[in-house]
Design a protein with these regions (language model features):
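Eukaryote-biased, non-catalytic alpha-solenoid scaffold regions
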Residues: 1-227
């Protein structure tokens, strides 16, 4: 796999790294027509401004919960394209880190739906249960965009042990052999950053935990899923 021009680092996340997720339909579950996801993106991007204008956090939380519930319902209806699109919009807004209150709100809401997202991404990254000529549902490029998004989110959540474990399981479940260099690069970059900031005199237990998690993850990466 050729190295991309732009290094995949934790601090590099921006909208240029984001492409719409397109999932191929199966004969049993034809693709639903695509929604106008840009309207959903604008809706989520307004959260930060609404908070600055002192709008109630409860109102914004309710709106976000309704949005994620819609994604869940679309998944149950096999509308994977639009469900993944909604999840991607919410995650991308979280990664922009516009507002501390919004970060906490988005983290809490995403934590609640991680099991649903895990199931959806597992289905979308595998051909099991679908026509053999539609393999996999996510193309290589689409899958790798999702992996980059999830690794970035995972690296920001390492201190939350339960969520960290859930996210690492999703990553290991999704990856194909050809994806490994991307994950190795991102995790190695974060390891190097943490080691540079390590104090020689002060013991930072949280930092030690992060280092162990990342080192363990790299050891778990050799994977047997083949195209």
């Amino acid at each position: 796999m050729e190295k991309e021009d732009k290094d995949l680092r934790l601090d590099d996340w921006d909208e240029e790294n984001i492409e719409e997720v397109v999932i191929l339909p199966s004969s049993r579950h034809p693709a639903a027509p695509p929604m106008d996801l840009e309207k959903y993106r604008q809706r989520v991007e307004r959260y930060s401004e609404r908070l600055r204008q002192r709008e109630s956090v409860t109102v914004i939380t309710t709106d976000l919960e309704e949005l994620l519930f819609e994604a869940e319902q679309r998944t149950l209806q096999y509308d994977y394209y639009n469900a993944l699109g909604i999840y991607a919009i919410v995650l991308d807004e979280r990664l922009k880190e516009r507002n501390a209150t919004l970060i906490r709100l988005l983290d809490h809401s995403m934590d609640e739906v991680i099991p649903d997202l895990a199931t959806l991404l597992s289905e979308a990254s595998s051909s099991l249960g679908y026509d053999s000529n539609v393999t996999p549902l996510l193309s290589k490029e689409e899958r790798q965009h999702w992996l980059t998004r999830l690794v970035t989110f995972w690296l920001k959540r390492l201190d939350n042990r339960e969520i960290e474990e859930d996210l690492s399981e999703i990553l290991l479940d999704m990856i194909w052999q050809e994806d490994i260099p991307i994950l190795v690069e991102m995790v190695t970059n974060e390891l190097q950053r943490l080691r540079k900031g390590k104090s020689s005199t002060i013991v930072d237990l949280n930092q030690q935990y992060r280092l162990r998690v990342l080192e363990r993850f790299l050891k778990e990466l050799p994977y047997t899923k083949q195209e």
